[in-house]
From Swiss-Prot:
Bilayer topology term: Single-pass membrane protein
Any one cellular-component term (Gene Ontology): virion membrane
Family to which this protein belongs: Belongs to the asfivirus inner membrane protein p12 family.
Keyword annotations: Disulfide bond, Late protein, Membrane, Transmembrane, Transmembrane helix, Viral envelope protein, Virion
Protein name: Inner membrane protein p12
Keyword Transmembrane: yes
Modification after translation, per record: Not glycosylated.
Subcellular locations according to the entry: Virion membrane
Induction trigger: Expressed in the late phase of the viral replicative cycle.
């Protein structure tokens, strides 16, 4: 069952697979480095209640 216009032994499938993996990795990184810090920033309403390091802010435990 060869696809029309495919050459090189399923190179189209390999390309789609690589692109899919890259998209998944980028989505995971975006979630951890953008979404998580934003969710943590919402927890602290006042600036003096926040503690920030490495770009991620969270409510002070003390």
């Amino acid at each position: 069952m060869a696809l029309d216009g495919s050459s090189g032994g399923g190179s189209n499938v390999e390309t789609l697979l690589i692109v899919a993996i890259i998209v998944v990795i980028m989505a995971i990184m975006l979630y951890y480095f953008w979404w998580m810090p934003r969710q943590q920033q919402k927890k602290c309403s006042k600036a003096e209640e926040c503690t920030c390091n490495n770009g991620s802010c969270s409510l002070k435990t003390s």
